[in-house]
């Protein structure tokens, strides 16, 4: 994720006299030399965007070096990864019986360790590009390093899902706070609309949880899955439309919410029930409407960005065909696959 962050640090100043002739320019240059293109406080710093606050230049009195130091608050454009993030393009650089190593082609520089398993070890080849999901609490930003490190695995369609129990209505103020995430989704949907429709169908079908025969049609324009995979008693709601109605107090968020496997992962759809009849493996999570919607919206963003990145990375039929072994590994993990 790309974001703005604010940091605090203390800089050592070798030549305080020269430094103070043009503090802002020297300070910005020093910050860029030390932090840009490196890891710092759980982020990878892309650019220094501003100096928010600085102290005077203090002279060190513990020795006779004549050096100084300055406390600084600055803002920076950063990139950072979170647990369970999806990365569409990780190039395999090493694969042996002990470990698989990959480098992300899309995010900040990061080396990803893929724990070796029999299936993944036998399939992934050096030089191939694989989609990866990061593991829980697996991203490490060691200060001063020029790349982060993480652990993950080749991303396989998930069979499990969470159910959320909302017992208080979403307020207009909370709905307004969610519009930033809604805007990101709409931007990603706009970007998606400009991509090759055949590619979108290929990857949506690949990451649909159920195994789909080649003659089953996907109506991606209305996010409708193959016949027989729908929850016949329920009609999904568009989360974006729901939140726009919430701004006008025209919708109720009470009840049980979920995004079960019959929905396309990147669809802006969810199911809402008065009584919980979802066939989930875990008990419902009791939470506020705001927390639930933030969770759903971020999941939709993650998958939409993932699908867009897949289309951009595997942008021709030859490249897709060169990775048929990866697609087969993914296909074999679906519900209903004939082993």
UniProtKB/Swiss-Prot annotation:
GO terms for cellular component: DNA-directed RNA polymerase complex; host cell cytoplasm; virion component. Keywords: DNA-directed RNA polymerase, Early protein, Host cytoplasm, Transcription, Viral transcription, Virion. Induction: Expressed in the early phase of the viral replicative cycle. It comes from the Viruses. Its main location: host cell. Contains an extended C-terminus, with no homology to characterized proteins. Belongs to the asfivirus D339L family. This is DNA-directed RNA polymerase RPB7 homolog. The lineage of its organism: Viruses, Varidnaviria, Bamfordvirae, Nucleocytoviricota, Pokkesviricetes.
